[in-house]
Amino acid sequence: MKRLLLSIVLSGLVSQAAFASADLAKAKNCMSCHAVGNKLIGPSYKDVAAKYAGDAGAEDRLTQKVLKGGSGAWGPVPMPANTQVSEAEARTLVKWVLSQK
């Protein structure tokens, strides 16, 4: 019974973290150009996760791309710098993006 209760509590915490990160992406206007499962202006989060799967340095590089912007990795439209996003928020967002399957 304790294991069942622990599983329920932990799954709730994981779900809350996932929803919190999706809410953060919406609040920081990431969803204006990106979506979880389909390409908009920028790549889908699932495509980003697939491209960087197994890349140990991806989290750090993508955190900097969120903060400073970038170009060339996904086509001709550059990603602008996101001055409204703190480094901690960028890291949270990147971890969430990389967790998409």
Which positions does each model-derived feature cover?
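Axial heme c-ligation environment in periplasmic c-type cytochrome domains
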Residues: 41-50, 65-94
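The canonical Cys-X-X-Cys-His
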Residues: 29-36, 93
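Gly/Gly-Pro-rich "capping" loops immediately C-terminal to redox-active cysteine motifs
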Residues: 26, 35-65
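Sec/Tat signal peptide C-region and signal peptidase I cleavage site
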Residues: 14-20
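Immediate flanking context of iron-sulfur cluster ligation sites
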Residues: 22-24
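Sec-dependent N-terminal signal peptides
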Residues: 4-13
